[in-house]
Amino acid sequence: MEPFRIHKGTAAVLMNDNIDTDQIIPKQYLKRIERTGFGKFLFDEWRYDNERHENPNFPLNAPDRKGASILITGDNFGCGSSREHAPWALADYGFRVIIAGGFADIFYMNCMKNGMLPIVMDKDMRENLTKTDAREQIEVDLENEVITTSTHRFHFTIEKMWKEKLLNGLDEISITMQYEQEIREYERKVAVY
């Protein structure tokens, strides 16, 4: 996993509350276990009409929001089923940071495990952040827990364990590999039957 320290990017705004994982990526696209290729299906039923033409009224389809890597959204983001495909779709689309009023617990952990930073921020702060010009680069500094725009600085908090994992680019496998020598020693000592 790539370490996450400072991210600079533009933001897309989708301030709906209770966006569930089926709205993030509908179930008909979950037939694969690779982590890539899901971005084109992100918010599929909102981004496209029945003939697969882009919906011009959907915020992510606005020309000045294309290429955004920060998503500012409502409360309870990622609720519903715990499909890991939802963070995969967000990451494959290009999002590195999701800022919401809150997240479903499993979705929150799945974001972290996939190298994305989910930030919990109150509504007033998010609304101030949405006023940032669509072309402005927003800086997200994980180490100092600060989001900076040209006019504001917003502080956020993150649990120390998750912060360290993201800063160091550690997933479960890389953490296990830190104990490779101890595992080998244990396996040598234990009898094989």
UniProtKB/Swiss-Prot annotation:
Upper classification of the organism: Bacteria, Bacillati, Bacillota, Bacilli, Bacillales
SUPFAM superfamilies: LeuD/IlvD-like (SSF52016)
Pathway involvement of the protein, from the record: Amino-acid biosynthesis; L-leucine biosynthesis; L-leucine from 3-methyl-2-oxobutanoate: step 2/4
Keyword Amino-acid biosynthesis assigned: yes
Family: Belongs to the LeuD family. LeuD type 1 subfamily.
GO CC annotation, single: 3-isopropylmalate dehydratase complex
Top-level enzyme category: lyase
GO molecular function, one term: 3-isopropylmalate dehydratase activity
Pfam families: Aconitase_C
Annotated InterPro entries: 3-IsopropMal_deHydase_ssu (IPR004431), Aconitase/3IPM_dehydase_swvl (IPR015928), AconitaseA/IPMdHydase_ssu_swvl (IPR000573), IPMI_Swivel (IPR033940), LeuD (IPR050075)
Complex and partners: Heterodimer of LeuC and LeuD.
Record's catalysed reaction(s): (2R,3S)-3-isopropylmalate = (2S)-2-isopropylmalate
Enzyme Commission number(s) from the entry: 4.2.1.33
Entry protein name: 3-isopropylmalate dehydratase small subunit
Role of this protein: Catalyzes the isomerization between 2-isopropylmalate and 3-isopropylmalate, via the formation of 2-isopropylmaleate.
Top-level taxon of the source organism: Bacteria
Gene Ontology terms: biological process: L-leucine biosynthetic process
Swiss-Prot/TrEMBL keywords: Amino-acid biosynthesis, Branched-chain amino acid biosynthesis, Leucine biosynthesis, Lyase
